[in-house]
């Protein structure tokens, strides 16, 4: 069976719960959501650079890092992957342009 985002989310949850000095996940969470968001931003930039450089292997590696840090950020704010999936499922009921137009503006 393939490794999924749910598997990764479960790993993040387990490491957040057990922690310990050896847990990178726990260290990120202990530094707070702002730090987790900053790390996600760094990984996003690295992913973009890999894509622009057309380096397939580097892009895959950076995307893996990006997904991990996204799940850590979600965990830091108490948002689950299932909740994000529910939003995505709801958006599938209309076209992309309709969905974008329906979003509330700040």
Segments predicted by a language model, with ranges:
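Flexible "arm" and connector segments at domain edges
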Residues: 1-63, 67-106
């Amino acid at each position: 069976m393939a490794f999924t985002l749910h598997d990764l989310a479960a790993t993040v949850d387990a490491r957040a719960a057990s922690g310990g000095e050896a847990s990178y996940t726990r260290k990120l969470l202990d530094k707070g959501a702002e730090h987790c968001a900053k790390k996600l931003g760094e990984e996003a930039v690295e992913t973009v650079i890999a894509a622009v450089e057309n380096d397939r292997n580097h892009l895959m590696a950076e995307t893996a890092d990006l997904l991990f840090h996204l799940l850590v950020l979600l965990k830091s704010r108490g948002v689950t992957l299932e909740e994000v999936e529910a939003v995505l499922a709801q958006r599938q009921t209309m076209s992309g342009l309709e969905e974008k137009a329906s979003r509330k503006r700040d």
